Amino acid sequence: MITMQCLHADLAQAVRRLLQIILSLCAIAVFAGAQQVDIVAKLRLAQSFEQTGVWDRAVTIYESLLESNPQNFVILEGLRRSYMELKRYDKAMELVRQQLRGNPTDENLLSILGGLYDLAGQPQTADSIWHVVIKKDPKNANLYRLIAAQLVDHRQYDKAIEIYLEGREATKNQSLFVEELASLYGALHQYESATHEYVKIVRANPQQMTYIQSRLSSFTGREEGRRAALGVIKDEVARNKEEVPLYSILAWLFMEGKHYEAALEQYRIIDRLTKAKGSELFQFGQRAAQEHAYLPSAKAFREVVDGKPAANIVPFARFGYARAIEELSVENDTIARAPGQLSSGVGRGSTISETQPTFQGAMALYESLIMDHPNTETAMQALFRIGTIRFTRFFDLSGAAAAFDKVRTMPFSSNLMYEATLSLAEVQTARNDLGRTRGEYDRLLSSSPEPYRDRVLFRLAELNYFEARFDSASAVLQRISGNATNDLTNDALQLLYFIQENKTAGQAALTEFALADLMVRQRKYSEAIVRFQSVLTQHPTTALVDDATMRIGELQLLLNRVDDALAVFRTVTNDMPASILRDHAQMRIGEIYENRLKNKQKAIDAYEHVLANYPTSLFVEEARKRIRMLRGDSL
């Protein structure tokens, strides 16, 4: 019995001791946890002072934290950074020395110590420490990187380059540090040296060519940088005549400098070396067209077609050639400079040439493509282009409508079907069949995908404006202008503000103006001038007078009445002192002298007038640019 009592007493005592131990451990854990929370809070506060540049406060907190956490890497690094920002290099050095006591051969700490001596104005000591690091293992590339990183941080790019070159020599590896050296050479505007380094990369790994082009572009945007790179690549190509990546970079550099003919020559070589059967030339033609270099684009596409191309690219190359001829015709065909004239039909014997392109020639190419590749998406695109030329260049409304109608029956591209319907509606507007125009837009609105709806809505708003339904037009325009990401937002806002601003001046004046705008859309230019002049005579006190006068000037230009256009614009600048369009009118005078009359001096005088009389105008920068171009100054 006594034994049992003793056992119970011993057990109770053991339990009490265990509970005491558990409670003690809990108390210690709670204390440690509280301490840890306090450390984290202080550390965050110090880091926030760092981020805001309050370095003194950061130092105070880091120093207090270091007393209880002498081995904490985060605290040590934060304190060293703060000392460096305050230029307390001696304290930063002492901090690093304390760390080195535990590991006196640590390369990273030694390189940092050397960097601190360098910042403190003791470069010889810094060099000595750094070379101690390097001598530990002269063939270890990472040691050179450690030292160079310190020099780069201090913006001592020349010395960093020396370290990298020393590393190359020691390791007998000329491929080391290529990207690092290229970047440093570029930063020092040593473009030839930078290009030599990038060439090493692309020769070792041709798949890196696109990446190297992006790196070269960091300085080839400057003419001196592009010229330097061009010289290096030309020399490399001359020494390595079978290396396609070098030709590709050379072609790219020519393209960057807008030297498309020279780029085309490189693509001919690339196509031959790679046995690409025209696909490389085809890609060049596409890119040149995207950059509006239509003559070399046309040459490339024609060479593809005339060669022995892969069968799958033939229709696309023919379409690309036709598109290039079409674009070249804009500047060379007399119809393009005198819109509104009608053209005779296109004969099969029409002459087609890159040097004397015509819209008739372009249409002949499209028609031939349709005949040879019927019932294809390419044929559908060609037919759409025929409709566009007939409408926008020849104003052949019947021919355009027939083409667009046929495109809508072809099932190869829903987007082209929508575009054809939009264009057909424009043809109906030009025919003054506004009821059919509205019907086309209503059908599109109910069936077209989201990207087309705002375009359709804007056209409907214009139609409402032409028909003097100004409230309806405003309601539709407000829907469009509410979408800030829409490409049409600015156009919608301009028309909306124009309607709202001028509707209060009187429905009759705005109705007359809108009818004149409709006649412009229908290319009834002479009748439109009469309508705008009616606004001037019948509503002389409205704000529409300024806009009507400017419209008359533009229409005189479209009718090739250049002197009359100049007279109208001078009326705005000289006789309408309250007009907010005087700067625009003066700018148009300069543009007429520059582009239509080819009188360089009078154009310069007109642009200088913009600078002198309208210093706050939005046209000032453009006027300055035009003056520099006309004088042959560097832009």
Question: Where do the PLM segments sit?
Answer:
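Acidic, polar-rich low-complexity tracts and alpha-helical solenoid repeat scaffolds
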Residues: Q35-L635
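Bacterial Sec-dependent N-terminal signal peptides
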Residues: M1-V40
